[in-house]
Amino acid sequence: MRTIESILADIDQLKAELDILRQSLDNVTIKEALEVEFLYESNRIEGNTLTLRETQLVINEGMTISGKSMREHLEAINHKEAILFIDDLVSQKVDLSEYVLKQIHGIVLYGIDRENAGVYRKLPVAIAGSKHLPPQPYLLQDLMDGYFQFYNQAKDHLHPVVLAAEMHERLVTIHPFIDGNGRTSRLIMNLILLQYGFPLAIIGGDYDSRMAYYDALEKVQTENNKEDFILLIAEKVLFALQRYINILSPERIKQLLNDSL
């Protein structure tokens, strides 16, 4: 198995190549396609049954899919709005904060659970199929204060991919909201990645990918072993970079990279 350090080295090399390509190529269409795939897979992890094509029709064409629930439609629409909000944050160089987190969660649950959208939970919760028991509600504010303190201290010295993975895992583990913690955590992870110029990291919603994701999280939560989770996220970022570059014209890539040397 590869080490985190070796994957991060490959990530840095590919990121440098992508930065060169972005100076000369329009990548808006690619970015939009990957955003649709991200929100499809993120919702799929949580049990949404819309297909990738149906998701695209709902968010881009405004269609209603027969046989699918209103909640599933709203989850897709809200996720798209959350990504647009994140894009605005990145373009305006707005840093992660408690206000930003609650805004993102509020968008995720908009029209689904108005009472709890953007609000820390007031009830204890248990996660089906997990040995991890999220903290009691009275502990949440102190834990979330520590969450943002960690971010502000770590953002200047951790590799961006490791930072994104840490903020993802820590938020899922604290589980501050009554619902939407997973989707919000994956959005926060990608907010950080986008802020540092990386493409969206997509975690698959198929059974094997979902189980690998849950198992890596469980290992952090029950054994305090972060290696598998950080490795998983790093591999997703590496794949995203490889895919992004490969989608672009091979000849144009070769020309641009040669010209930059």
Predicted segments, located by residue:
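FIC/Doc superfamily catalytic core
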Residues: 1-261
